[in-house]
Each structure stands twice: as structure tokens, then as C-alpha cells.
Amino acid sequence: MENLESRLKNAPYFRCEKGTDSIPLCRKCETRVLAWKIFSTKEWFCRINDISQRRFLVGILKQLNSLYLLHYFQNILQTTQGKDFIYNRSRIDLSKKEGKVVKSSLNQMLDKTVEQKMKEILYWFANSTQWTKANYTLLLLQMCNPKLLLTAANVIRVLFLREENNISGLNQDITDVCFSPEKDHSSKSATSQVYWTAKTQHTSLPLSKAPENEHFLGAASNPEEPWRNSLRCISEMNRLFSGKADITKPGYDPCNLLVDLDDIRDLSSGFSKYRDFIRYLPIHLSKYILRMLDRHTLNKCASVSQHWAAMAQQVKMDLSAHGFIQNQITFLQGSYTRGIDPNYANKVSIPVPKMVDDGKSMRVKHPKWKLRTKNEYNLWTAYQNEETQQVLMEERNVFCGTYNVRILSDTWDQNRVIHYSGGDLIAVSSNRKIHLLDIIQVKAIPVEFRGHAGSVRALFLCEEENFLLSGSYDLSIRYWDLKSGVCTRIFGGHQGTITCMDLCKNRLVSGGRDCQVKVWDVDTGKCLKTFRHKDPILATRINDTYIVSSCERGLVKVWHIAMAQLVKTLSGHEGAVKCLFFDQWHLLSGSTDGLVMAWSMVGKYERCLMAFKHPKEVLDVSLLFLRVISACADGKIRIYNFFNGNCMKVIKANGRGDPVLSFFIQGNRISVCHISTFAKRINVGWNGIEPSATAQGGNASLTECAHVRLHIAGHLPASRLPVAAVQPMTGGMAPTTAPTHVLAMLILFSGV
């Protein structure tokens, strides 16, 4: 068998000639005819243009009407999918481009006569034996460049699966059918016999890899020697297919053997068992489906095909334009003050769910479901088919009027953490050190708090009780005396970085990256209770009855302090929940997915009531007089109506768009912290009371900034603001005659 294989390998080169002859002398036997056809093909094939080469190659491949031959060439051309072959095919050969310009006139002359030669060879090839077809095709593929080989691989794959589907007339699953030629044959006319056997193992292609107990062509299959198996296939074909192939069919026309360009595109585009449904769908449906994917997955889809890449690019552009339009609409809504009375105040009845004894909500006896549009959805429709009761609450258009800004610090620090409790001091941390800033005098207090071995990640200032709490990367919480700066107590127990803290009376709650929420007694420093998540804690809040905590997974959990039990778990966010706020009736959660979600704190009611959309992640949130106040990573503070989700006001916290890390509300003032600055902003008259402008003694109150009140619509550069608009202030803030560059510091935001 090995000798037969070696002779077969050299069969195309058998010649009836002497060693010095360049042209065969005999054209009668099959070997000599094959040699002459190959010789004549070499004369013109490499000199014609690419289109003619492709038409001739595809015409030859279409005459391979044997499933066995198609599978053989498919195995040979598997290397065209390798990375080295793809790299070589994608390279630009400048020398070939220059050569094509020189040979263009010669190609025009060749094209007139070569088409007739191609038709003659195709007619001869169609009536040749399988042995001749196999060897001629092998030598023709040797003359092809990498791009033509890729076309050949795609065409053979398509033809193979088409022939396979035609043979499988019993509607068998083609993945469970194995094709092989029958070993019994007649001496005169051996024809291809095909049978199928069911397999339990899934195979991507028939005859790809047989199990160990099966034999192919009477010999054991060895996956380590694919080339020897291929030669064995050729030797078997020499024995089986020595006769002429009968391909004459009704309506057969030898003039149509040369394939046109449309057929080439259909065949060379590849074939798969699974259709590309995106390509067959209308464009608007394809884009609608791709729009559901996240950006990372959408980038991967662009590598599937050119059509998918075009669709993915259009979806990205649509999403970008949609986000820009939505952001502009929200900004215009927040900047449009007409119809929004900053002094508006009213008492309204708000629905809250009715609860039974076990804390579950009561449903109506005969529910009626109704589909509502986005504009029809509000707080009242959120309790659809739920029994509710009315609770009287007060609403006000807080922070919707004019405002002024006072910059307390203008240093860039992405690790800055601040806390403000409404007094005269603000606690500020930078790395491991903590200091206090007097917002009245706008100067630092000389007391410095040192002792943490790691950076400070959480602060809580209690100015009334004269102490400061700090949580650090060193896993400890420290209790500091404000006047002396001495650490009087250390809370130990966390096994991860302290990320958040909150205080209610003498109960401190802390969360860390150890996935634990701990409740402490501030007076004794003892840990009273521990609650657990499965992911690191990012935010926590406490009141007399409940503790609310959130984690990186996007879950919000409500715990009962006295009973030490989990009341409910709120899920709905697709990103980590970084901020929380709750009162007796409602709970707000802000996440990296750009949503603020409103929930009910009553009993075990777990449905989301409202969702407030932001262009980027939400870093802080609060609820005041039924107005949702949120800080976003795009550098803006937004005020939403809790009833219907409408944005009432958009405030630019800084001109550079730095993320707003946190804010603290006290009366009609907001302390804002972001990466580059933190400022004390005074909102003027949202509750109908104008701040006093009188200064007593040498200490000027913050309300003196009310004299820098702006009545312009929009934002004006500092150079266009009148210097006389700034009244004299003491306390080191501004001199009596403030220059223009000081105005820019005093009035960072100039909105209405």
C-alpha cells in the first residue's frame, strides 16, 4: 500500500518523453492527456486577471460531483483558516499591483482567446474520471494565490454540504450521518455508493473523525497521520473510480460550465448550517436586537462579518445620538424655570401600601391590568392592583431658584472624603490625615488628626457631640475628640477596608469590603450585631428601626435592628449600588448603571416605584420634600419630581465636568464635594425666605454671598460679570474691591 501511495503521489508527473523534452509526445493515455492539460493550463492561467481565474476555478470545483472528492479537498484546504495563512492573504503586495499595470494590454488580448480554452478544459474535465479530476484539481490549486485558495475552500464547503443534503433524503440529521464509499465494486464500472450510519457522538462534518472502534476503508483511522489517510483515499479512488463519470443530465449545456460572477459570490461567501438571521431581517429589526446588547458585546459583534460590523456601527451612533439628545432634553428641562415656582409648597396625599400582620402587602380582589405609556406612569400607578392608604406629606420645589457659590478649596484630589453635619465645620480627609475647615472663616483649624496606617475612606462628623469618626484602609474605625485631636477609641472587627458609615443616636453602622455590616455602640466601642452580604459593602444607612445596606452586586437589603433579621432584598439594579437614602416611607438607591430607583420602606413590599435616569453613574442621592436630589459622575446635580420622575433642575457643579462625589444638605444650603474642589452653595429663597445679608462683627456669615445673586438665564463668563455685584465681605474671602479673577472663584456656577 505504501508503494502504491508513493506512485500515486507522483502520478501527475508521469510523462511519455525523454528527460530533455519539454513537451509530452503522447496524448492518448489518461496520464499523458492529464499532463498535456496541465501544461496548457499553466501557459495562460497565471497570466489572466483575477476574475477570470476565479470563474475558471469555481467552474472546475463545481464539476466535483463526488461527495468523497469534496470531503478530500475540504480536508486539504482546512489550513486556509489558520492565522498565518490569513496574515499572508491580508498583506498588500505592491509588486503585483505594478505588474498588473504593465500586463494590462496583454491581458486584454488574452481574455479574447482564453475563454474558449477554459470552456474546452471544463468540458474535458466534466467527462473525466475521478482520478483525473482529483489530480488536475490538486495541480490547479498549486497555481492559486492565497485569496483564490480561500475562495476554493468556501466553494468546496458549500458544495459538500449541498451534496450531503441532497443525499440525505430520509430527513436524517446531518450531524449524525457518516458517509463512506462501498468497498464492493464491479470490474467494469465502479460507481460511488454512499450509505449512512447513525452515531451518538456529535461531529461537525461527516467523516471528520471516527471513533476508535470504527474502521475507514478497511484500515484503522489514525488522527496523527491525516496526510497518509488522504493518500489512502486517493489510492482507493484509483481502484473504485476508474470509469468515466456520468454527469450528463437533462438540459445539460457545456457552454454554461463557465460560472458567472453572481454564482461565484453566492458560493464563495461560505456556508453554515445556521443562517445569519440578522442579515435576513429588516434593518430596523436588526438594529433593535443589537441595541439590547451592552457596548462590550456589541464590539465583539463587529468582528462577525461586514454586515454585522456595519449594523454595530450604526447602533453605536444611534445610541450616542440618543444619549446626547436625552442629556440635552434633561438639561433644558432643568434649566427651564418658567412654570416652576421656587417658593411652591403644598401638602399632598401620597399612597403607601397596606400591610397585613406578616408584613406583606394586600392585593385588590379583582385586579385590572392596564398598559401605560411612559408619560402615564407615576407614583400612583406604581401601586397597580395593590391596596394602598393615603399619607399626608409636604412637597416643595427645593433648590429650583437662583443660587450662589462659595469655593472653599480648589485643589485637585480624587481621594478626598468630606462630611458636613450642618454646623460651622467640615471634616476633610486626604490619604491618612484628617483636618477640619471652618466654613465661616474659610480657613483650616490647626488641630490635625493622625493615627491611621492607611488612607481614610469614610468620615462622620458630629459637631454637636464634639467627636469625629473615621474609617480607614487599615480595617479600623477611630473615635476622635474634636478639640484635642486625640483618638480616644478604636473599633476593631472588620476584615476588609471600611467603605461607609452612618450614625443614629449612639448607634454606629459600618460597612466594609469584607461583605459585613456591623452595628456598634459608640459609647463602649462594642460590636452589637453583624449582618452579611455576599459582596463588598458600598453604602449603608441607619435609623431607629432599620439598617439599609447595598453591595457591588447591585442588591439592597433592609435589616430590622431589634430583631436582627433580614426584612427584604431589593433587586433591579444592573450595577453596583453606591449610595442610599431612606426615611419612614421611601428608600432611594443610586447605582453605577445610571439609575436612581425608588422603593417603599413599608413592610415587605419589594416592587420598584420609580426610576430616575442619569447619563452616568450616580454617586450620591437624597430625598427632601418629595424631591429627589442626585449627584452624577457627569458633574451635575439633578432635582427630580418624586411623583412623575420629571427633571425639574440641572445644576452644573463645576465647569470641568468632574464627578460630584458627595453632597450634604442643611437648610437651604448644599455642601458639594468633587475631585477638583469642594464648595458651599447657598440656594436663595426656595422656601420663600430670603437669607439675611447683615454681617455681625468680624465674622461674616455665609449668607453674605446672597449679595452676589445672579438674575441671568444661562452661564456668563466671569469677565462679563460686573465687579460691583460683589459686596464687601470679611473673613478672608474677598477684599472690598474684588478683581475679576476673584469673581471666577466666588461664582463658579452662575445658573438660574
Curated annotation (Swiss-Prot):
Superkingdom of this protein's organism: Eukaryota
Gene3D superfamilies (alphabetical): 1.20.1280.50, YVTN repeat-like/Quinoprotein amine dehydrogenase (2.130.10.10)
InterPro entries in alphabetical order: F-box-like_dom_sf, G-protein_beta_WD-40_rep, SCF_subunit_WD-repeat, WD40/YVTN_repeat-like_dom_sf, WD40_repeat_CS, WD40_repeat_dom_sf, WD40_rpt
Presence of the UniProt keyword Repeat in the record: yes
Start and stop residues of the WD repeats: 169-206, 451-490, 493-532, 534-569, 572-609, 611-652
Tissues with expression: Expressed in pancreas, heart and skeletal muscle.
CDD domains: F-box_FBXW10, WD40
UniProtKB keywords: Repeat, WD repeat
Further remarks about this protein from its record: FBXW10B gene is located centromeric to and partially within proximal CMT1A-REP element. CMT1A-REP is a complex binary repeat element flanking a 1.5-Mb DNA region duplicated in Charcot-Marie-Tooth disease type I (CMT1A) or deleted in Hereditary neuropathy (HNPP).
PANTHER family: F-BOX AND WD REPEAT DOMAIN CONTAINING PROTEIN 10B-RELATED, UBIQUITIN LIGASE SPECIFICITY FACTOR/HREP PROTEIN
Protein name (record): F-box and WD repeat domain containing protein 10B
